[in-house]
A protein has these predicted regions:
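Glycine/charge-rich, flexible interdomain linkers and switch-proximal surface loops
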Residues: 42-50, 89, 105-112
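Residue-level signature of catalytic and energy-coupling elements of molecular machines
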Residues: 4, 26, 41, 92, ...
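ATP-dependent NMP and nucleoside kinases share a basic, alpha-helical "lid"
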Residues: 17-79
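NTP-dependent small-molecule kinase module
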Residues: 1-5, 10-11, 73-79, 97-145
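Anionic, Ser/Thr-rich low-complexity intrinsically disordered regions
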Residues: 46, 60, 67, 83-91, ...
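Metal-dependent phosphoesterase signature
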Residues: 5-23
């Protein structure tokens, strides 16, 4: 099974994502996929600005480089990956730079996205609880209680 969040995949993703033809094909696929469902949750670095700019709810995850690198390093260590922390941090820094500076579909925060600062959230259930509260509030405001 392929792990889409592996270091190797992450490293190549930001390089491939710069290619205009690749972005066009993926954009078309993602938009078609989203239209097939009345409710959909899609994760990606340009989903809220390019793929689904009119989505009801958009989250923009924010985390400082050191915290993100520590989490990624810990994740890789669990998988017995022999890698140094400084390398993980540098790889994340390069990927982030590529994503925000690429010409085609750069990483941007849409004006209506909810910022989720994950620096202080130590566990996934904490983050899920916060996001669920935001979704429930949005549903109540749009459809009533």
């Amino acid at each position: 099974m392929i792990n889409l969040h592996s270091a190797k995949i992450s490293e190549h993703t930001s390089i491939i994502a710069k290619e205009k033809k690749v972005r066009l094909v993926l954009k078309l696929f993602q938009k078609r996929f989203a239209k097939r469902f009345s409710k959909v949750c899609i994760e990606g670095r340009d989903i809220g600005t390019v793929i689904l700019p009119k989505a009801d709810i958009k989250f923009f995850f924010k985390c400082d480089l050191s915290t993100a690198a520590k989490r990624r390093f810990k994740e890789l260590k669990k998988k017995n990956k022999k890698i140094k922390f400084q390398i993980v941090k540098k790889q994340l820094q390069i990927r982030n730079f590529r994503d925000v500076s690429r010409k085609n579909s750069p990483l941007l925060k849409s004006s209506d996205a909810v910022i989720v600062n994950t620096e202080k959230l130590r566990k996934i259930p904490d983050m899920m609880k916060k996001m669920s509260e935001i979704v429930e509030k949005k549903i109540r405001s749009k459809y009533g209680s």
